[in-house]
From Swiss-Prot:
The gene is 75. Keywords: Virion, Virion tegument. This is Probable membrane antigen 75. One of its GO terms (cellular component) is viral tegument. NCBIfam families: tegu_FGAM_synt. GO terms for molecular function: phosphoribosylformylglycinamidine synthase activity. One of its GO terms (biological process) is purine nucleotide biosynthetic process. It is found in: Virion tegument.
Length: 1315
């Protein structure tokens, strides 16, 4: 069939069959909100309880061939495979071709989901990818919609129906399906439907072009303002730093792990992000081979309500945007270790409006230095695109059906990392991308460096070539140029472009191949798409060649085809644009500025002001974000946002190691021979504290002050840099000359961006005075390019959003630092500041109350540098034992947050002569530090010499009831118990959890039962406390461990680090390289981690296993794994939701095999053990307690028998479920339960029964083992807590722990292998 989707553009669709299934399911969060609001209530909309049902609608489209006899068996097999793959979503419910709930009088049935005329969703891409791993290629699209059925007490009118639809469906991303699904068209190809076609006009970003690009003969303005005396610059907008990196051994290269000099780079971006992996791809184009270390994430939104009190829809809009970006970081293997959420009250004189949430992201990565070298760019290079071509949908909103595929991005990463491990000399000649949000055509022009290329039509994406081959040219009804522009060149697509040499090069195995052949072979291993688009030529421009009759082959000396047309890069001359109907000169609204005097303050009650400040979303807890993102998954994170026993997100900075393995320093003191006779007692007498001395790390932080930038752009920007410094100063010792400040800006376009340029010049001058490095990595316009985001019903604000966000990274060689957790009664709190009386302009206080309180003053760079140096010295000398920077909310918020993690009595006093409101809520750069009283005179002397304010403001004491109070002029103006203070500060976050998560009513009273984990080390406490058990890199080649990955996964580096630190010879092995049943004969251990890139990790795990099962006749992988598990000298570990599910299936299979007599053999199949989602229904990142029973059969857990230990637990499916009754009882009876989630107390009987200590709220089982104890599958990941500095919190009495008990698991297995 054919269809016209656009005027003059015809489409051809393949013959297909579509099946619809209905499956009972739980309410979605939106449906749950509807039920809670309107069930059995008076009014026109009154849902009758007992009649409200929710179903999933599974829509499967399969390609049909011309022979009907072959179709029946093939598509029935395909449908069965889809059902098996989606079984985690169906939860064993009955599948029906029609809804199980028929319509009656007053019954309403609403069927909704993704628009089937648009391109397939990300979920569909994942499912088809997983099916293709089973050899099933006939499935063209799989989508999941929803059906809500209910009876209403009254007849539903259109206006009432609109109320329902507003509650449950997304206006932009979801449509209503007609009953019977009659006459509907399913688009199965990545070719846009009409509404998603990008119009060429209005896609340029004027601000980006003016700041980041070369205009005429001048170098880009970003390069003009860069101040980089101490770092190298591989491009105009990127600063780097030097370190070292361990390259993990890939088994197919036959090389061991190796150490290399490494380059570190931080890439930031601020703007309306619609392609979640775009920032990662930009960084990948700079460092083609890199390992992600950490990310930061932030969000802005404006609000008209007092103190930004949001309704449900506003909350959902902000946090779904933020969390889908965080989820991409999770799937791409980059922990999110810092950030912010700022809601700006759009009242008073501010008048700023963001039409949708604006996001900030930055990514820190390391790359082997030699891989930065490129070969000469010249004619004859091969033009390559990596990744699956899928054009982006720019207006994607919740539920973000069209989010970028992290799995596809990971395949590109796997292919590139494998390629660079294989080649021995530079082979890539260009990998440049255009800056900002740009189309395929713009990226190609950037890649070609003002050169040229022949691009062949036969090499374009297969879906587009299919259309061109099946529609005669005479029937195209439009020019070829227009067609290719619409469907390829003018799309936003997340593919990575590069050019490579076309000459033979040597591999690490000494073989000679052309680089493109090496890349193709490695990409085939990781199922990564490689498109050879053409070749570079002398002639400037992109020259389109029609070679459909005789397709291009890069190996041929001569190519045939007809030159159709050429495209040329437009001149670099950015054109400003204005909004429709907007006048050229904007009318400035009158802004009443109050004088700096404090007469206005008479009507304010301090107690109420403090409470409103703590209730502010900008100041209050961000636990809803922090505890639902990956914050430590690569094993390198030393400091993430959560601090103290309650895991409160209060850390000012983050700390990330560059490597967890230390290269050998000459003759190592340990010998591999010792493992043969080593006992656990001997192990705990080893004390190698020097192993991790001076190991390199990066300290990261973010600074941003949009309210101050709005009041005074240049001075406000300097405050953002100052906040960055105050965030960092309590971290490990660092030199300002090593600090790289990476700025990202967004601005209203106009007036040649002179105001923005002046601000950036001020930043450069400030950086030069401070002696820090400064670079601009991105610039964007805050005016939405798509007019659909402009609400014409609301008058345009006087100004669009203007802001700068600065991320800072600094290399350090120590982890000694201070945290915002009070340490000791008898100590005092001291306020050190540049100027505590500077006023309230641009503060949170001013914004809450809609005031205009003066202007933002200049800031002294010498004072800022002195403040940084004094605080840094105090931390390193041990004088400062805790501290917190003064920032959002002012001094009172800073001191209150210092109190939250403790049970002390803290009485704060406003110094004489200072006005309480002006002093408590000012946000002058400064810090509050905890010191001993006898250290105060020395600190005062240092501050006085530097011209800094230094005043003791609070005393820390013990008391019967802990509380925080503020005294001014001898009177208590605020006093609140700490339990109440914590509740106030957490109000906004708790409200988000209730509003945006699944039904938590059952566990509502337990949601505060988190943290304060008691531990029990049993008889090993003394050895673990006193001795630092660690080893240099010295792999035992007799004992190899394979860390098993799949295409689309991230590197499971935490497991790699852990086994390598236990001196195993560790290799990364992809499932696709297993080519023989004897593949694992040289391996003693096998590990499977949790780095899955697919949106639904449990579906991915089922897909990985079913691919092994259904291809076992053709693939040796399953036979190799079964052979490995059945050997008596092997062990395995599966961690996290993915690793647990894979390994648990083999453990249960081995258990069942043990009951068979003689030589009977049961076919491997999925076991009755499965996983269920967390109680919240979303990703969890928690520091939870686990109990290892005395009777555990696990060999690996043997050193920790009887212990209660805290550990990191991260994932979406963190609870066991069973397809048949009695399975859990069987696990307990057969002693297969290896560990379980535990409560707060260390009592062995205190099993965790409720969320969040038990993430699913059901089964408390956290791990199982095989009958013989050799194989262990856990939902926890012990490798994330291998060293004490990886622990979220060390409980009282264990602060000086030298060796983590979790490391004993890995040492134990090395001893076992040698026994």
């Amino acid at each position: 069939m054919s269809l016209y989707l656009l005027p003059n553009i015809r489409r051809v669709f393949k013959d297909s069959l579509t099946r619809i299934w209905f499956v009972d399911t739980d309410y979605s969060i939106e449906e749950e909100q509807l039920v809670m609001k309107f069930m059995d209530v008076p009014g026109d909309l009154s849902l009758i309880s007992g009649t409200i049902f929710s179903e999933l609608i599974i829509i499967v489209t399969i390609e049909t061939s011309h022979t009907a006899s072959d179709d029946e068996s093939s598509y029935e097999r395909a449908l069965a495979a889809v059902r098996e793959l989606l079984s985690p979503l169906m939860k064993n419910a009955t599948v029906s071709p029609i809804s199980r709930y028929p319509k009656r009088q007053r019954t309403t049935k609403i069927m909704y989901g993704p628009d089937l005329k648009r391109i397939p969703t990300n979920f569909s891409r994942d499912v088809m990818d997983l099916l293709q791993q089973q050899g099933i290629t006939s499935v063209m699209r799989v989508e999941v919609g929803r059906c809500l059925t209910f009876d209403n007490r009254h007849e539903l009118y259109d206006i009432t129906m609109d109320m329902v639809l507003k509650e449950i469906k997304s206006k932009e991303s979801q449509i209503i399906y007609m009953e019977g699904f009659e006459n509907f068209t399913v688009n199965t190809e990545p070719i846009h439907y009409a509404s998603d076609i990008i119009q060429v006009t209005g896609t340029e970003d004027y601000v980006c072009d003016m700041i980041m690009k070369k205009i005429g003969p001048d170098v880009p303005f970003a390069q003009q303002v860069a101040y980089l005396p101490n770092v190298s610059i591989p491009s105009t907008s990127v600063a780097t730093a030097l370190s070292f990196k361990l390259r993990a051994a890939m088994y197919f290269t036959k090389e061991m792990s190796s150490f290399h000099y490494a380059i570190l780079q931080c890439q930031g971006n601020l703007g309306f992000i619609s392609q979640q992996t775009d920032g990662l791809r930009m960084q990948r184009s700079i460092l083609m081979e890199n390992s992600p270390l950490a990310s930061c994430l932030g969000a802005y939104v404006t609000n008209f309500a007092f103190n930004c009190r949001q309704d449900y829809k506003e909350m959902k809009k902000l946090y779904t945007s933020l969390m889908v970006q965080a989820a991409t970081n999770i799937r791409a293997g980059s922990p999110t270790v810092g950030g912010f959420v700022r809601l700006i009250c759009n009242n008073g004189g501010l008048k700023v409006k963001l039409y949708r949430p604006m996001l900030y992201e930055c990514h820190l990565a390391s790359s082997i230095g030699s891989n930065l070298k490129t070969a000469d760019f010249r004619p004859g290079n091969i033009l390559v695109a990596l990744g699956q071509f899928y054009p982006s949908v720019l207006d994607d909103t919740h539920p973000f059906y069209y989010r970028d595929s992290a799995a596809d991005y990971n395949k590109v990463v796997q292919a590139l990392n494998g390629f660079y491990c294989t080649v021995t000399s530079p082979c890539v000649t260009s990998s440049l991308r255009d800056l900002g949000k740009k189309t395929v055509k713009q990226h190609l022009f950037a890649l070609l460096k003002n050169g040229g290329a022949n691009l062949y039509i036969s090499c374009l994406p297969a879906a587009l070539v299919y259309q061109l081959q099946r529609i005669p040219e005479t029937e195209w009804l439009c020019s070829l140029e227009h067609l290719l522009d619409v469907y390829f060149f003018n799309t936003y697509a997340n593919i990575l472009f590069l050019t490579v040499k076309n000459t033979s090069e040597y591999t690490t195995l000494g073989q000679q191949f052309k680089p493109i052949e090496i890349l193709q072979n490695v990409a085939r291993l990781f199922k990564c798409d490689v498109h050879i688009l053409g070749e570079t030529v002398d002639k400037i421009g992109i020259h389109v060649i029609n070679d459909l009759g005789n397709p291009y082959n890069y190996t041929s000396r001569r190519h045939y085809g007809q030159h159709c047309y050429s495209m040329f890069k437009p001149p670099e001359n950015p054109q400003d644009y204005t909004l429709p109907g907007a006048s050229e000169e904007e009318e400035e609204l009158e802004c009443v500025v109050l004088t700096p005097g404090l007469d206005w303050a008479q009507g304010f009650v301090i107690e109420e002001c403090i409470r409103n400040t703590l209730l502010s979303p900008t100041v209050g807890s961000k636990a809803f974000v922090v505890q639902h993102i990956d914050r430590c998954g690569n094993g390198l994170v030393v400091q993430q946002p959560g601090v103290g026993r309650f895991d409160f997100p209060l850390a000012d900075y983050s700390l990330v190691l560059h490597s967890l393995v230390k290269p050998p320093m000459g003759d190592t003191p340990d010998s591999l021979a010792m493992w043969k006779s080593l006992s656990l007692e001997d192990l705990l007498n080893i004390n190698n504290a020097e192993v991790h001395e001076n190991i390199p790390a990066s300290c990261m932080a973010v600074g941003e002050q949009p309210l101050k930038v709005a009041a005074s752009p240049s001075n406000g920007a300097l405050r953002a840099i100052a906040e960055l410094l105050t965030n960092l100063m309590l971290g490990p010792k660092m030199l300002l000359s090593n600090l790289i400040v990476t700025a990202s800006v967004t601005w209203e376009s106009g007036q040649s961006c002179e105001e923005l340029k002046a601000m950036l010049r001020a930043c450069r001058a400030f950086a030069e005075q401070l002696g820090v490095n400064f670079v601009v990595s991105s610039a964007s316009s805050s005016v939405p390019q798509d007019s659909r985001h402009l609400n014409t019903g609301i008058p345009r604000p006087s100004k669009f959003f203007k802001n700068i966000v600065c991320s800072g990274t600094c290399k350090v060689t120590s982890v000694k630092r201070a945290l915002p957790v009070l340490q000791k009664a008898g100590n005092i709190l001291v306020h050190v500041s540049i100027d505590p009386t500077e006023g309230l302009a641009g503060t949170v206080f001013e914004n809450i109350y809609g005031l205009s309180l003066g202007t933002v003053s200049e800031i002294s760079a010498p004072k800022m540098a002195a403040l940084f140096a004094i605080i840094q010295d105090g931390v390193q000398e041990g004088v400062i034992v805790s501290g917190h920077d003064v920032s959002d909310g002012g001094l009172v918020a800073c001191v209150a947050e210092l109190c939250l993690s403790t049970e002390f009595v803290v009485r704060m006093t406003v110094p004489e002569g200072l006005h309480a409101l002006g002093y408590l809520f000012a946000e002058s750069p400064g810090v509050v530090v905890e010191i001993s009283p006898n250290q105060l005179p020395a600190l005062r002397d240092k501050c006085s010499a530097a011209g800094l304010f230094c005043q003791d403001i609070a005393y820390i004491t013990n008391g019967d009831e802990s509380f925080f109070s503020v005294v001014s002029n001898g009177k208590i103006v605020f006093q609140q118990p700490l339990s109440s203070l914590r509740a106030t500060w957490s109000t906004y976050s708790d409200g988000l959890l209730s509003a945006l998560c699944s039904d938590l009513e059952e566990d509502e009273r337990h949601k505060g039962d988190y943290g304060c984990n008691e531990v029990d080390f049993r008889g090993l406490k003394e050895g673990l406390m006193n001795n630092y058990v660690a080893f240099y890199y010295n792999p035992d080649i007799q004992n190899k461990v394979a860390v098993l990955t799949w295409p689309g996964m991230t590197k499971d580096e935490s497991l790699f680090w852990a086994f390598t630190n236990a001196q195993f010879d560790t290799y990364m092995v992809c499932i696709t390289e297993i080519n023989s049943p004897s593949f694992f004969n040289d391996f003693r251990g096998l590990a499977i981690g949790n780095g899955v890139g697919y949106t639904e990790p449990l579906v991915a795990a089922v897909g990985a296993l079913t691919a092994l099962i259904h291809t076992q006749g053709d693939s040796p992988a399953l036979r190799a794994l079964l052979h490995f598990f059945n050997r008596a000298d092997t062990f395995s570990l599966g961690c996290g939701e993915f690793g647990f599910f894979i390994l648990s299936q083999f453990i249960y299979y081995l258990h069942e095999q043990s009951f068979l007599v003689g030589h009977q053999h049961e076919e491997f199949k999925l076991s009755p053990i499965s996983l269920e989602k967390t109680k919240s229904g979303i990703y969890e990142s928690r520091w939870l307690s686990v109990h290892i029973p005395e009777t555990t059969g696990s060999i690996m857990l043997a050193p920790c028998r009887g212990m209660v230990l805290p550990c990191w637990v991260q994932g979406t499916y963190l609870g066991l479920s069973y397809k048949t009754d009695g399975v859990e009882s069987e696990l307990y009876n057969e002693n297969l339960v290896a560990c379980s989630f535990h409560g707060k107390s260390s009592s062995s009987e205190n099993f965790a029964r409720h969320y969040p200590r038990n993430p699913s709220g059901n089964s408390s089982v956290a791990g199982i083992c095989s009958d013989d104890g050799r194989h262990l599958a856990t939902l926890i990941d012990p490798s994330l807590s291998f060293f004490p500095f990886q622990w979220q919190h060390l409980p009282s009495g264990y602060e000086r722990m030298q060796t983590s008990p979790w490391s004993l698991l890995f040492y134990q297995m090395h001893m076992w292998c040698c026994s």
